[in-house]
Amino acid sequence: MGDMKTPDFDDLLAAFDIPDPTSLDAKEAIQTPSEENESPLKPPGICMDESVSLSHSGSAPDVPAVSVIVKNTSRQESFEAEKDHITPSLLHNGFRGSDLPPDPHNCGKFDSTFMNGDSARSFPGKLEPPKSEPLPTFNQFSPISSPEPEDPIKDNGFGIKPKHSDSYFPPPLGCGAVGGPVLEALAKFPVPELHMFDHFCKKEPKPEPLPLGSQQEHEQSGQNTVEPHKDPDATRFFGEALEFNSHPSNSIGESKGLARELGTCSSVPPRQRLKPAHSKLSSCVAALVALQAKRVASVTKEDQPGHTKDLSGPTKESSKGSPKMPKSPKSPRSPLEATRKSIKPSDSPRSICSDSSSKGSPSVAASSPPAIPKVRIKTIKTSSGEIKRTVTRILPDPDDPSKSPVGSPLGSAIAEAPSEMPGDEVPVEEHFPEAGTNSGSPQGARKGDESMTKASDSSSPSCSSGPRVPKGAAPGSQTGKKQQSTALQASTLAPANLLPKAVHLANLNLVPHSVAASVTAKSSVQRRSQPQLTQMSVPLVHQVKKAAPLIVEVFNKVLHSSNPVPLYAPNLSPPADSRIHVPASGYCCLECGDAFALEKSLSQHYGRRSVHIEVLCTLCSKTLLFFNKCSLLRHARDHKSKGLVMQCSQLLVKPISADQMFVSAPVNSTAPAAPAPSSSPKHGLTSGSASPPPPALPLYPDPVRLIRYSIKCLECHKQMRDYMVLAAHFQRTTEETEGLTCQVCQMLLPNQCSFCAHQRIHAHKSPYCCPECGVLCRSAYFQTHVKENCLHYARKVGYRCIHCGVVHLTLALLKSHIQERHCQVFHKCAFCPMAFKTASSTADHSATQHPTQPHRPSQLIYKCSCEMVFNKKRHIQQHFYQNVSKTQVGVFKCPECPLLFVQKPELMQHVKSTHGVPRNVDELSSLQSSADTSSSRPGSRVPTEPPATSVAARSSSLPSGRWGRPEAHRRVEARPRLRNTGWTCQECQEWVPDRESYVSHMKKSHGRTLKRYPCRQCEQSFHTPNSLRKHIRNNHDTVKKFYTCGYCTEDSPSFPRPSLLESHISLMHGIRNPDLSQTSKVKPPGGHSPQVNHLKRPVSGVGDAPGTSNGATVSSTKRHKSLFQCAKCSFATDSGLEFQSHIPQHQVDSSTAQCLLCGLCYTSASSLSRHLFIVHKVRDQEEEEEEEAAAAEMAVEVAEPEEGSGEEVPMETRENGLEECAGEPLSADPEARRLLGPAPEDDGGHNDHSQPQASQDQDSHTLSPQV
């Protein structure tokens, strides 16, 4: 019989998942001969090669692999010629075994207890200790993975590289390793199929050296493997002797021996530590390419009856073979299968391994999972030194469809498949590791690949030295494997420098073309050759990221989810009388396959609202809003048709409410597939309608004699159809905006014709053509039409954010917006390229990753949303301003409120509906007359607009505010309108429309830097409007108002604000809501009010002016029309008797004290006295009587009678405000005085000349009651 390639030890490690042998009992694997047909355990003969291959399960738990049949040339002659060369034994994986004596019957000297299956733990004492010299490395083999998704860990990698083989029937003294060149007989004979039992005692005399690190690790691993256990080489030959006499009675010994052999691999490190990472992919991919390119007919077991053993079950629990294949009675069964079944649960995916050709498996478990397709690889080394492989897939039986797996786990095998032959490297398609390993890819595999993903997630015991690779970890994400990941990425991944956060739509050719072509070729080959196998699905979206965020998963779910409803098929046969022409296939949606009979229906299909998807398209440089995935894919298809690759970032996917799903908005059939967000004053995003918006016409019809309509453009001399077309001609927007910005007022004009008409406004030249509607106006009315009717100065320059489309009025606002919303600040480590969001995270990173480095502060770096990174803030600011001219857009600001509009018709509609327009021509004439007559104050620096006057002056002349609004609104709006009247530079007499332009003009033209709020009347400027108002009030407001109290009889203090006057009246006079309409007075500049300087108690005398009440001068402001006014009900009268008869009705109780001067009531006499003294300046009666007596005595002694006063000189003090009536003395009776009441003002006119000088205690002219 022929011989078979010896499997490399680390290749065998990659195929199986072996638990820690210290936790296993060897007796657990024992099966009696009577149970071998019912139990899934199969007690085959002991094969140490297969036992050793169990040791690498922990190295790649997620790497599915397939054990293969290696066809090699017969080596019987060479091995028979070399069987006398016995050297110190080496394990065929490069590990040193014990140096046994060259006794040809050495294997017969083993302990009989071990031969009978007892525990072999006592056997190492009989062997020589292992040697510690450096070992040659055998790393030529790599696992070959099958392109099927449900291949968890399988036996693989036999025969990828040519190595020396031994004869299947070794001589009795076959304890030593036999060497010899391999190339002598590689191509001599067509080799029949062999199985794993042909692999014995092989040594490669010329191994390829490993790198130093890997060699040392290899050597250390080999020593650690052999030292604590018995010599595996001797055990292997002992197993060989048992194999020739394989009987059912040896099953106990086999199981025990195998369990003992498991201890040999407990400390074997994973394959990743033994092999360089850069050689892991090429061999596997070469096998896949050969498998796809050359489909060689499978050689069945019946064609080669002598060689039907091909590892019938060391891997997939002996369940991958076909139950219909006959069992070979001579086939010894693998001990790995029995051990695998004894230590692995049947439902553990990692215990499922597939043999390469298990059609002739001796037994099949009834509950075994579906079979994995097998691969047969023929390896031939040519004379030139190249290695050629022929890969043939052995398909499962067609009568068992459950054995056809779905998907492909190629990525796991490719990511772990090493190869050291540079000639065998094949470029690896990027989508394989993305789909198979799920290395940070958000999409993973589709629903068909769920079984593979679940199998990778399952956990099982592993070797103690084999670290697990977590699911979803990117290559190189584990600590300690940086070199491997770097080599893997450098040698295998496609050179696609994709943005981090960028999502690429692969189904629209958004991955590199070579990758997409490879995927297409592979899919087509599999469809032609293997229709029964489910093809690997290419993911639609690639997320180049270490970990997929939740929003990306939702985004992928939206894009990848299948249609919940069947495809819509319309009725393409309309009635004949409908005269509807329908295409043969209707109007079909290229994204989902739905077809429609009408084009409008297709447009409504693209405009349906199902989900809120907001992405930033890097090609369009703006944020797009989609409400269904068809519109998103259609937008990507538009880019694909131009040869571009759509990349989108800043994902925002969220559901929409049911009330927002159905919006009654007409959908234009020519609207783009990606409707922008709805237009708003703040964002300024257009709806993207294909038809131009209608022109904005004037707010109201102009007076006929003031304007003249023309249908010819005076700028380009183009004849128009009507005035609407002329207005649209002046308002059309051109794509080229260079040279359309006015240098005087910085206004951005829509086109050249409008720009020329606008320039003549500043030059004051005719013809006076409106830049908005194109009409001709007379010079006197031109500014009125331009400002009030067409709102030309509502045009402003806005700056649109290229990232989100938000429009700002200034560059400073745009810069702050970008820095806050679209700029990310990171703290970069000073020793490595890692960057973190916070400084504390960077410090923790430095402490853990760079503990020996001196402490250095982290560096701030700035990342723009376009993925550019800057290490200085000024660089990113320069990056913001590099394309400022491209961000300028024209917006329209309402002159009455701060709202912004993108379209001029929207502004006009807003003004009409919110602020109103003139109702008739009379108002227009009044507007015109006010414009002609109003002018600014001389000597002030108030900027005026030429040739018409300010809007505020014209609006103030209107009878009811701006075109029909109430007077109250007119007063409120008068002040804001003053700020919008424009500015005139006093140095160059240039007029600018707004404050910002005035500040910019002063800085550019005259080199003066003004603050944000300059004063119109002087050269000062301020930062806040409050400071400006205070400055104007204190320095420029020469005409001031003061407010006096009309209820105070004497000279009362003035109040600068009405609120202070209201407080005074409420507190002093008890009136809550006084009428202040007649209380204000204008204070002359630099002067004082006469009442302010009056004495508080003026002395009555001859100099008193006639015609005043009680001989005192009473101002009309102080005294209203009525002398007596009731404080309770505002009753007023000039008659004192009438007033005294009125106030008792407000007296609730007779015991209540009531003021006879104002009618207010008090609970006690003391309160009334205090009120009389404070408000009416009337003292108590006793004090008044004493003062009157003292004054009378003084008058008798000193005073002389005046002008015929007679002999009797009564002392008329008028302290109570009651004048003498017809020369009668004042009655002393209080009741009589109360009933008498105050005399009219006319009665006091005759006795003014006889009134003596008042005493110093007289306080008021009002009537004082007797208490």
Curated annotation (Swiss-Prot):
A zinc finger (C2H2-type) spans 587-612, 615-639, 711-731, 740-764, 768-790, 799-822, 827-850, 892-915, 983-1006, 1013-1036, 1043-1069, 1124-1146, 1153-1176. One of its GO terms (biological process) is negative regulation of insulin receptor signaling pathway. Residues 1199-1210 have a biased composition (Acidic residues). It comes from Homo sapiens (Human). One of its GO terms (molecular function) is insulin receptor substrate binding. Residues 476-488, 1250-1267 have a biased composition (Polar residues). Disulfide bonds: none annotated. Residues 345-369, 456-465, 925-936 have a biased composition (Low complexity). The keyword Cytoplasm does not apply. The modification Phosphoserine is found at S78, S142, S145, S146, S529, S573, S689, S691, S1089, S1205, S1250. Keywords: DNA-binding, Isopeptide bond, Metal-binding, Nucleus, Phosphoprotein, Repeat, Transcription, Transcription regulation, Ubl conjugation, Zinc, Zinc-finger. This is Zinc finger protein 592. Changing G1046R: Found in a patient with clinical features of Galloway-Mowat syndrome; uncertain significance. InterPro entries: Zn532-like, Znf-C2H2_11, Znf_C2H2_sf, Znf_C2H2_type. Interacts with ZMYND8. It is found in: Nucleus. SMART domains: ZnF_C2H2. There is a cross-link at K202, K206, K546 (Glycyl lysine isopeptide (Lys-Gly) (interchain with G-Cter in SUMO2)). Widely expressed, with highest levels in skeletal muscle. Expressed throughout the central nervous system, including in the cerebellum and cerebellar vermis, with higher expression in the substantia nigra. Widely expressed in fetal tissues. May be involved in transcriptional regulation. Residues 300-310 have a biased composition (Basic and acidic residues). Its main location: nucleus. It comes from the Eukaryota. Belongs to the krueppel C2H2-type zinc-finger protein family. Residues 1-62, 124-153, 205-280, 295-488, 673-696, 918-970, 1195-1267 are annotated as: Disordered. One of its GO terms (cellular component) is nucleus.
